[in-house]
């Protein structure tokens, strides 16, 4: 199965209501608050499909709405290797902080206009990391048996969920990374230049900012896809068609800032809205 890397300069994101979303930038804004976590993301593949915004809306946390590019929202399947996760001011945690991971993610805007991702699942191969992340931020981490291999320029990811179910939440992705992607691809920036996540935790919608260097993106050819994760995340039928965008990156080193209530105003605005 082959697919392209995604369009160059599509239409700008459109929104039917709410505060105008912040501009999309390939470089990060200043990290608000103090840094709390640091981790490296390596050998990532980004598979993305168009989905109608009304399909995404019920899957997002309160106080957010679907982010839209070229008339639709998007869902991403992103397998990669987590490396040296740990506290921002200390070394990465040996063994525990390095493992394969696969995310299913959506694209959101909050009532302050901040763009982010929303994770439907984060499949990870380290049970203590899964349990800690669920307890600390109610992130939807799940324990999975996962492998990432690279042979003769072909990268293979395979994952099977272990806990909590369903056990048939599996995925297998095989790609061949291509040439470096030149700057200026509007869709690539929309899908990857995300400087926060939104999550629902302890009765609130949280905004968790992050920062890292610009993504070193490459084109990629999708050689094989057998996915059941998207359906398990409430998106049946999406993975039965080829993705609309396929990208690859050798990775970045990222730092997360302090989570805050998504209703809180951005610095300097003095404005908060209900969620």
Regions inferred by a protein language model and the residue ranges of each:
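Compositionally biased, low-complexity flexible segments
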Residues: 1-15
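Active-site-adjacent core segments of small-molecule enzymes
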Residues: 17, 27-32, 90-94, 98-100, ...
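Hydrophobic, proline/glycine-rich low-complexity stretches
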Residues: 17-88, 238-275
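Extended, compositionally biased
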Residues: 72-124
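Internal, well-folded beta-alpha domain core
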Residues: 103-275
């Amino acid at each position: 199965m082959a697919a392209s890397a995604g369009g160059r300069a599509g239409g700008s994101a459109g929104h039917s209501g709410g505060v105008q979303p912040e501009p999309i930038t390939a470089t990060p804004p200043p990290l608000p608050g103090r840094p709390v976590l640091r981790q490296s993301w390596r050998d990532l593949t980004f598979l993305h499909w168009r989905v109608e915004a009304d399909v995404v809306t019920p899957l997002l946390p309160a106080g957010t709405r679907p982010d839209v590019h070229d008339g639709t929202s998007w869902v991403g399947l992103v397998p990669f290797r987590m490396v040296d996760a740990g506290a921002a001011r200390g070394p990465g945690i040996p063994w525990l902080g390095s493992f394969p991971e696969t995310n299913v993610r959506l694209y959101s805007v909050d009532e302050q206009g901040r763009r982010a991702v929303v994770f439907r699942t984060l499949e990870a191969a380290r049970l203590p990391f899964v349990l800690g992340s669920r307890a600390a931020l109610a992130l939807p981490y799940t324990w999975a048996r996962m492998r990432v291999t690279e042979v003769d320029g072909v990268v293979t990811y395979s994952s099977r969920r272990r806990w909590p179910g369903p056990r048939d939440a599996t995925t297998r992705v095989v790609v061949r990374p291509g040439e470096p992607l030149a700057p200026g691809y509007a869709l690539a920036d929309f899908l990857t230049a995300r400087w926060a996540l939104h999550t629902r935790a302890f009765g609130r919608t949280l905004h968790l900012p992050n920062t890292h260097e610009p993504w070193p993106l490459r084109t990629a050819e999708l050689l094989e896809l057998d996915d059941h994760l998207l359906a398990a995340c409430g998106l049946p039928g999406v993975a039965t068609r080829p993705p609309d965008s396929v990208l690859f990156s050798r990775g970045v080193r990222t730092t997360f800032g302090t989570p805050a209530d998504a209703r809180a105003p951005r610095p300097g605005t003095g404005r908060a809205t209900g969620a």
